[in-house]
Amino acid sequence: MRALRRLIQGRILLLTICAAGIGGTFQFGYNLSIINAPTLHIQEFTNETWQARTGEPLPDHLVLLMWSLIVSLYPLGGLFGALLAGPLAITLGRKKSLLVNNIFVVSAAILFGFSRKAGSFEMIMLGRLLVGVNAGVSMNIQPMYLGESAPKELRGAVAMSSAIFTALGIVMGQVVGLRELLGGPQAWPLLLASCLVPGALQLASLPLLPESPRYLLIDCGDTEACLAALRRLRGSGDLAGELEELEEERAACQGCRARRPWELFQHRALRRQVTSLVVLGSAMELCGNDSVYAYASSVFRKAGVPEAKIQYAIIGTGSCELLTAVVSCVVIERVGRRVLLIGGYSLMTCWGSIFTVALCLQSSFPWTLYLAMACIFAFILSFGIGPAGVTGILATELFDQMARPAACMVCGALMWIMLILVGLGFPFIMEALSHFLYVPFLGVCVCGAIYTGLFLPETKGKTFQEISKELHRLNFPRRAQGPTWRSLEVIQSTEL
């Protein structure tokens, strides 16, 4: 609680979190969820547009194909954005990268807003690709920016705010997409274009806030700018100790250049970090949480929830993830990262198993549908308290300043690739396994919990230098000398 009070007292840091989040991971969650409400309206618009051009309506299977393209272009854009994030973070800095990233949102909002008037569903497709690029960049750079700007005792909580804004974006998108608001047949272009609002808020607020002190000192070599940023972020406290830590980290990175993504896989000194990033990053996307959202509507419908009320029940699922993200942010610096990950995956295994049994027994015992409905909420709560937020800060905490942008690129690209694969494969898994569709996902949850327990070191309350030393000891258990991956040549550039 002392750390939480310090966060509240550090008003500039709190404002930085809000400004980065509203135009960052909030956009990811918001654009992920708002596309669900106008599904039928956009399909009708696509069919009508095609008929106006050719004189013939589109066959049903082609309408579905067009819709699948509109949905799938979002994660594809996210993949491009993730690959763009590393070079942007190094060339422009963390803060400027987030600001420049809004170009994609503004362009997409214009395309969405005028798509119906122009009679072009292609504008919707291009807009979805652009908001995907925006999400891919922000999902990587925001945790990096906030993790580098926070003091070590608040680093986990501050970085976890990315998960809070993602969940908040999902809920806000579900609310704005209600039929009573912008989810109607006439307002859907405004619904899609509403992503401009959080982008405008970030453009108005983030320029007034400081850049990452670590970037200013280690990448730019500007001690005065670093000290000025620290003074604004920390207030009137003593900065000597933190500045000394930053100087030590700068000395450790002296003579090094920024790592390229493929170089992370070539060095034994980064073996455990990269393995943890790949295993736990894949587990977060393959654990079945996104599939729970996809399956929720049918479970609520079978449980007797009126069709008109299902949209409100879906908002409840998003609210669960938001609630647990807030709880996780509060407790992460008390219980640590490992406990949240192990506990989250273990609880997901438990609730997923009960959910599978409930689906199998629904024909014999109708009341098990209510049990399945409860398991959906419990599964989402368990995901939100652990994997949803903690996984996102691994790239920031496990890698040093020179490897961090490349690690974020790898983590982000992996996340979007897995999201695409799950989106493509889930319908076939559902058809092939029926009520047992969650068995593969449960296996992933078990593996995630076991890997965390055996191989992931705790980073709570440690400086980046302390984390690097511990990981070096784990990667080279029989050797005590300094890291072997440092270059002897002094390289001024940090270009990827």
From Swiss-Prot:
It is a multi-pass membrane protein. One of its GO terms (biological process) is D-glucose import. Gene3D superfamilies: MFS general substrate transporter like domains. One of its GO terms (cellular component) is nucleoplasm. Disulfide bonds: none annotated. Pfam families: Sugar_tr (PF00083). Belongs to the major facilitator superfamily. Sugar transporter (TC 2.A.1.1) family. Glucose transporter subfamily. This is Solute carrier family 2, facilitated glucose transporter member 11. The lineage of its organism: Eukaryota, Metazoa, Chordata, Craniata, Vertebrata.
